[in-house]
Design a protein with these regions (language model features):
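Sec-dependent signal peptide recognition
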Residues: 6-16, 358-361
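A short, hydrophobic C-terminal helix/tail in secreted or cell-surface proteins
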Residues: 355-373
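Sequence/structural signature of beta-propeller domains
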Residues: 28-352
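N-terminal secretory signal peptides that target proteins for export/translocation
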Residues: 1-9, 378-379
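Bacterial N-terminal signal peptides
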Residues: 13-23, 368
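Short linear Ser/Thr-Pro motifs
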Residues: 11, 22-23, 38, 358
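Membrane-interfacial segments
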Residues: 213, 376-377
Length: 379
């Protein structure tokens, strides 16, 4: 028999518990997608015909997003809402390195150092090109070819900038079929060697090549993919961690949820139950998966509002930001090649807000637990 006091106490407990559970904690596995910019009319809030197969994305702490549009050989700039930012009246900046398509930009980094100078000024943004060249932008309507001669036989699909021994270096992921490696350049864009055995996994898997490289918390994370001669990928993949001098640290993750991994992003604490996790974007199946940043253990995949994993046609960079015009610091920004890489999409993912009815169900569930506990106590 429940007295009025019993029911009142249970109700108070249920309310306290329900209110203490944030919507993010309850529904963090579901995310809302907002399409900001696309080359396809009507697909996003803004249209830009230059956004064709964007791969890398780079930015300074306050700058717009800079896109590496591989299939238009350009970079385009957008704020956090997708508004186009023109440079000197130019809607796009040309990236040299050869014709568009097979030679356009892939990986990209922001350069905040005084090195990597072109024409007497530091290149503020640096691009790796698919044909093994590197370009840099110092101003104006076009970037400058920093390495006039392509690295022989190289296919650059990723780029990182890091410091080692007081000097700054560029690290390019060369994903050439069966012979891929990490190529290193000094701050004068000259190729250098960090020593025999650098960027070598003692237990590397046959047929896998470096697909991308990214600096995370002072170490270089290299994503490996099993690629075919035409550049298409097979299922599988792994991620290694290296020091900036090229020494192998450990295998972070392997197989399982990885499918031609490429993009990396460390989630902020506000990103629901995935807060603080390392997110890895698969180019192979277009999924975004979360991993424990210390152990590399797989945690889960980002789901859409239908409860199914979000999947993209040709997923590349994913990024969080802490500043910038119209930037949502709680959003995961992503870029995707669509329509067989003849189109592009720039969007954001945010933790879905649960419906009021769902919250009521939770409260009733907590109330039920409270009643059951009271029965056991009074039995």
């Amino acid at each position: 028999m429940f007295t009025k006091q019993h029911l009142s106490g249970i109700a108070r407990i249920a309310c306290v518990v329900a209110l203490s559970i944030s919507p993010c904690a309850l529904f963090a596995s579901e995310f809302d997608q907002t399409n900001l910019v696309s080359s396809v009319p009507g697909l996003a809030a803004h249209q830009d015909s230059n956004l064709i197969d964007p791969w890398g994305v780079a930015f300074s702490p306050t700058s717009p997003f800079w896109m590496a549009n591989q299939n238009s050989a350009t970079t385009t700039l957008y704020d956090g809402s997708g508004n186009l930012i023109e440079i000197g009246g130019n809607p796009a900046i040309t990236i040299p390195g050869g014709a568009s398509g097979t030679a356009g930009p892939t990986g990209e980094v922001f350069n905040g150092t005084s090195g990597f100078q072109l024409n007497g000024s530091p290149a503020h943004f640096i691009f790796a090109n698919l044909n093994g060249t590197i370009s840099g932008w110092t101003g104006g309507a076009s970037a400058v070819l920093a390495t006039p001669a392509a690295t022989p036989g190289a296919t650059f699909t990723g780029l990182a900038l890091a410091s080692n021994g007081g000097a700054n270096y560029l690290y390019a992921a060369d994903s050439t079929y069966l012979t891929g490696k990490i190529d290193v350049f000094n701050s004068s864009f000259q190729p250098v060697s960090l020593g025999t055995g650098s960027f070598t996994d003692p237990n590397g898997l046959a047929g896998y090549v470096p697909f991308n490289i990214q600096l995370i918390d002072g170490q270089l994370y290299v994503a490996y993919a099993n690629l075919n001669p035409d550049g298409s990928s097979n299922p599988g993949g792994y991620v290694d961690i290296y020091n900036t001098n090229g020494t192998f640290v450990k295998r972070f993750a392997s197989g399982g949820a990885l499918n031609a991994p490429w993009g990396f992003a460390v989630a902020p604490a506000t990103f629901g139950s995935f807060g603080g996790d390392l997110l890895i974007a698969n180019n192979g199946n277009g999924w975004i998966n979360a991993f424990n940043p210390t152990t590399g253990a797989f945690i889960g995949s980002l789901d859409g509002s239908n409860g199914q994993p979000l999947a993209y046609q040709d997923l590349w960079a994913i990024d969080f930001r802490t500043g910038g015009t119209n930037v949502n610091t709680n959003a995961l920004y992503f870029v995707e090649g669509i329509n067989n890489d003849t189109g592009g999409l720039f969007g954001e993912l945010t933790v879905a807000t649960p419906e009021p009815a769902s919250l009521m169900l939770v409260m009733f569930g907590v109330l039920g637990l409270g009643l059951a506990a009271r029965r056991r106590k009074t039995a």
